[in-house]
Amino acid sequence: MVWTSAVVMASPHGSASRAGSNRRTDGLSVNLGQDNTLKHDTPTETAPSASPPRVAPAPIPPKGGPAATPGKDGALDNRGSHDSVPPVAVAIPGREEVNATASQKSVVAGANSQPTPGTQSSKAPASDVDGSSKHGSPEHPDAGSPEVNAEGVPVEEALQAIGDDDPLIHNLPDGVVGRRAPANPFNSSMYAKLRGKKKKHRPKVRDPKLNNNPLRGRLVVCISTTALLCWIYMWELIYNFTSFNGRCVSPVMYPDYKLQEAKQRQPYVIRYGYGGCEYNLGSLAYPRASFGTSAGDKGWPVDLVPNGSAGSAATSWDSPNARVLRHLGGLETNYIREYSETFRLFTSMYMHGGWLHILINLSCQIQILWIIEPDWGFLRTTLLFFLGGISGNLLSAVADPCSITVGSSGSMYALLGALIPYCVEYWKSIPRPGCILVFMIVVIIGILTGMAGFTDNYAHMGGALGGILWGFASITTVSACDKCTLGERMAMTPPFSWCVPKATQQKLLERAKARKAEAIRRRKLQAIQKKKAGGARGKAMYAVKMRLQEEGRPPCKMSFREWVIRGLCAAALFAYWLILFLYLLDPSLYKSYSPPGQLKFSGWLYCKCGTIVYQAPQTYGNLGRFWCFGSEKDAQYYLEP
């Protein structure tokens, strides 16, 4: 077992003083509070002077000196001369022991520490905690002299000079600032009342104007996309009402084709009102509705249009008529290929097919953007939403060209997929990782339930893949997952914590704290090298680096590992887009393969593509075009001569 710290003192009478049993007396004791920052426990006896004179290192004891004996708590006891000053052996959890003999704080702490009853303070040099001799240690060949850095300053003194709030260590603002996490109903005050407990209130940041809080006021993408999606859906409903379910937008009146005189059969422009539409639709013009079952119709009157009933369309209780989706830019592969309407890849991701559709997408989208956007920023989140939606629509257009698709589900699943690189990037500071796991389960359930209904699974899978690739292509660091405490944090998050005993949770918490302390110390050692920059040029470079660091983001190592991950994921995303665009727009490619269609629990849905060869009045303007049909009857009618 490795102790947090140990100050070793010896008694000439042979009784060892306790080290590390009560309050630690060294300057590197670690205590992680609610703010997850490293705190120093300094003894009350230490002089408050900022820079007291240094104490010379103790002489090396002779080889024939007395051997070290363990104390009651495992600390080692040395006996030696009263004229020497004891160096301090410091042990950080999860790391090998480091000798700090020249640090002023540690020396004064060891010199001024009061001995326990029945013992006297010893000034003999202490040996390492593992009992090995300092003089012959292969790791410390010359332990009599302190370990120094390139500037000649002892390493332990340099470590203590760097505060835990130094921007080189982290750039979070002062106070308890936690990362946003999915809403956990098990942590709500209402659920706490049901269980007969009080909800623990976390201390808030003393920043009433929220100037320094990196997790507030950065929801531009969340607010703007939500408002845009709602506005476009309102426009769909208005257009469905004013266009008579998408059947009439022209003011031209077409008289009955059975009239005797040719002049009476001539069309006329009705300049005011809906006279032209009312005449063309006859009794089928009413009732008018923006959505619901009343928005369905039987097509056009058969007394004016012989095959008018072929254009009938039914609607559900929360949806507008499907005709308006095609008019307003829904995703339909046939129009992209034959009429060069590639804009449908973009416009369809902002349209929705019903109230339930948009409410589900917005509820999930707002929750994830509330988590991701404050850390990823405006540009990175905007590109995530856009690239994810296009990625989903590309896969849908190529794999299922026989149906029309609308909705921001591709972008929403891109946000869900982006939670994976987000967790890798910020794992150490995510408040409730268990809820993130629940979100991942929602993705799987959503895809599986989509196989039973009229949902576009290709848009969901393509969006999730695009979100994962873009997240890793733009990731700042992957070092947060080094020695990540996944099991420990999951075990202490409800509802998983209900199944773990309190004693086990405490052990897991201590293990996580040990890893945290080691990580902070390692980053401090790296910060020593960064602080060497001096002069005007060095200060300017330091200022630029600080401006490039976004608040709330962990230190970006910019190492070879990060660049490899970014490059591979960016190349994969580019190849994904390139292949799908070629199969969507290149006739030599999309005419040579058969699309699979949607996969459901009942099997693959019918989808067949080919060139229209049937000559009839109904095929005017379509003869010779390459078209995809979702109906076997229509495919046989138009694709066979």
UniProtKB/Swiss-Prot annotation:
GO cellular component, one term: membrane
SUPFAM superfamilies cross-referenced by the UniProt entry: Rhomboid-like
Localization (cell): Membrane
TM annotation in the entry: 219-239, 352-372, 382-402, 404-424, 445-465, 567-587
Biological-process GO terms, alphabetical: cell adhesion molecule production; proteolysis
Biased composition, class Pro residues, residue ranges: 50-64
Region named Disordered: 1-87, 102-149, 162-210
Biased composition (Polar residues): 102-124
Keyword Transmembrane: yes
Topological type in the membrane: Multi-pass membrane protein
Superkingdom assignment: Eukaryota
Skewed-composition ranges (Basic residues): 194-204
Keywords: Hydrolase, Membrane, Protease, Serine protease, Transmembrane, Transmembrane helix
InterPro entries reported for this sequence: Pept_S54_Rhomboid-like_Rom4/5, Peptidase_S54_rhomboid-like, Peptidase_S54_rhomboid_dom, Rhomboid-like_sf
Function: Putative serine protease involved in intramembrane proteolysis and the subsequent release of polypeptides from their membrane anchors.
PANTHER family: RHOMBOID-LIKE PROTEIN, RHOMBOID-RELATED
Family: Belongs to the peptidase S54 family.
Protein's name according to its UniProt entry: Rhomboid-like protease 4
Organism: Toxoplasma gondii
The encoding gene: ROM4
